[in-house]
Amino acid sequence: MINCLIVDDDKKLLQYVSSHLERESIQTHTFTSGEASLDFLENKNVDIAIVDIMMSGMDGFELCQTLKDDYHIPVIMLTARDALSDKERAFLSGTDDYVTKPFEVKELLFRIKAVLRRYQINADNELQLGNLILNQSYMEITVGSKTMNLPNKEFQLLFLLASNPKHIFTRDDIIGKIWGFDYEGDDRTVDVHIKRLRQRLSKLKSSVSIQTVRGQGYRVDQNV
């Protein structure tokens, strides 16, 4: 099932859009502020986000940029602002599509599906490598009959590596893609997350392992 984040300070619109998407078997998570939606994403993953521009606190432009930079989520702007300058700013913020209010729900559905096709996200949102299955919707990994839920950052890191098997990622690559380039913490946090993931993969008896490439970084490989 596709998971959709909807952020708008208009509660009636949230209910309206959510009810129509749910009828199309799209699970929705609705929030009236960008801050609340980001709190939610600390523990959950979604496939796509629909974002209004005019909101108190964090506006839609800032939220869009955060969703793209930190969570790599496709975004559709849904807003009453139809000025060319607003559209330009939205696309510069990273939005994948721009829909103006009033709108037809059918058109919004077409656009959601079109954006997801571009991202090649399927309804199950799963990735398999060897005997390891990663489910992005639930942030869980499965080997055989055993399933384990992972913390957000650990799952994002493993998903990044597994999506690019044998590609070597430096610490800076990983920090930029998972924590953001403005991250000011210790770069050894990558090593800590890698160590935890190795322990989890070993516990599940996964055929996938995370290899250290001396002087370069990390990659995933399948054990023979």
From Swiss-Prot:
InterPro entries on file: CheY-like_superfamily (IPR011006), OmpR/PhoB-type_DNA-bd (IPR001867), Sig_transdc_resp-reg_receiver (IPR001789), WalR-like (IPR039420), WH-like_DNA-bd_sf (IPR036388)
Source organism superkingdom: Bacteria
Coiled coil: none
Domain Response regulatory, residue spans: 3-116
Subcellular location: Cytoplasm
Alphabetical list of Pfam families matching this protein: Response_reg, Trans_reg_C
Keyword Membrane: no
UniProt entry keywords in alphabetical sequence: Activator, Cytoplasm, DNA-binding, Phosphoprotein, Transcription, Transcription regulation, Two-component regulatory system, Virulence
Record SMART domains: REC, Trans_reg_C
GO biological processes: regulation of DNA-templated transcription
Name listed for the protein in its UniProt record: Heme response regulator HssR
Source organism of the structure: Staphylococcus epidermidis (strain ATCC 12228 / FDA PCI 1200)
